[in-house]
A protein has these predicted regions:
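Conserved serine/cysteine hydrolase catalytic core
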Residues: 187-231, 240
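Catalytic histidine neighborhood in serine/cysteine hydrolases
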Residues: 231-247
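Flexible "cap/lid" loop of the alpha/beta hydrolase fold
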Residues: 103, 107, 113-146
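Gly/Ala-rich beta-loop-alpha elbow adjacent to hydrolase catalytic centers
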Residues: 94, 98, 102
Length: 278
């Protein structure tokens, strides 16, 4: 499906029916990794309509030359919400760069968001410079896999803390999306990455259920930057997963699904938990 947002034909797919749930994918890839990583949690949580857009410059959504900074990308995301999720409250999930955009949505529209899931989130402007970032480590390695991997696949493997068959499968899934990414757009956005406003300062605390999941061995962002968000999320669970780097959804998929399922249960029960007469 497509919808026009500021002249950009936004490609998106949906799954299920019910309350709106917006999925924001990471940089350089597309909506397919979000569907693969998070769809399993809905087996036990019917009643949600998932929206999986390809963000500008990714997948099947183009990025016009005038799109040069993250504020503009956020406006596109907000426009997508206005066009497709019309007048409804929404739950938002974001992985990596998508997590940064999800925080932007909260900064602008927290009053209409019922819950938020952030996986390996942080400011990309801090990538590789955060003091708590561990060095690249490999905790599980299966060298027998190398004989069946292409040079491109081998080049991507060092980003994984757990280098097993699941990692290879994850690389192969994402290669198709990597081939579609608009490299000129990526250069523009990475040169002016952070929002013009302080995403760490929400207008008020986000009082609804949240889940923040970080990788203990994430050499790109670390985990302490994510911990610093907790003051803004009084209803958040914060989890740091061992045997997980920046590709946590692949390396610790089962644990992520368990945590996300529990969080979604809290989102579903939230109205009943709150005494609105107090």
């Amino acid at each position: 499906m497509q919808c026009d947002v500021q002249g950009i034909p936004m490609y998106y797919e949906t799954a299920g029916e019910g309350r709106p749930f917006l999925m924001l994918h990471g940089g350089y890839i597309d909506h397919r990794h979000m569907a693969h990583d998070l769809e399993p949690i809905f087996a036990n949580h019917p009643g949600w309509k998932r929206f999986y857009p390809d963000l500008p410059g990714h997948g099947r959504t183009p990025a016009p030359d005038w799109l040069t900074n993250q504020d503009q990308v956020l406006e596109i995301v907000l426009g997508f919400i206005d066009r497709v999720i019309v007048g409804s409250r929404v739950v938002v999930a974001g992985v990596s760069r998508g997590g940064y955009l999800a925080r932007g949505v909260l900064a602008k529209r927290s009053e209409s968001v019922d819950g938020v899931l952030l996986v390996t989130p942080a400011r990309h402007g801090n990538a590789g410079r955060v003091e708590d970032n561990p060095h690249n480590v490999v905790l599980v390695r299966d060298d027998s896999l190398l004989s069946n991997m292409s040079p491109v696949e081998k080049a991507l493997l060092p980003g994984y803390v757990v280098q097993n068959q699941k990692a290879v499968q994850g690389i192969r899934r994402n290669l198709l999306a990597l081939e579609l990414t608009d490299q000129a757009f990526q250069k523009r956005i990475m040169s002016d990455y952070e929002f013009s406003f302080d995403v760490d300062q929400l207008p008020s605390s986000f009082e609804r259920p949240a889940l923040i999941v970080a990788g203990r061995q994430d050499a790109l962002f670390g985990y302490l930057e994510s911990w610093k968000m907790m003051a803004q999320f009084p209803r958040a669970t914060f989890a740091v997963l061992d045997r997980a780097g920046h590709y946590l959804p692949t390396e610790q998929s089962d644990l992520l699904h368990t945590l996300a399922s529990e969080w979604l249960q809290r989102v579903e029960s939230y109205p009943a938990e709150v005494d609105h007469t107090a």
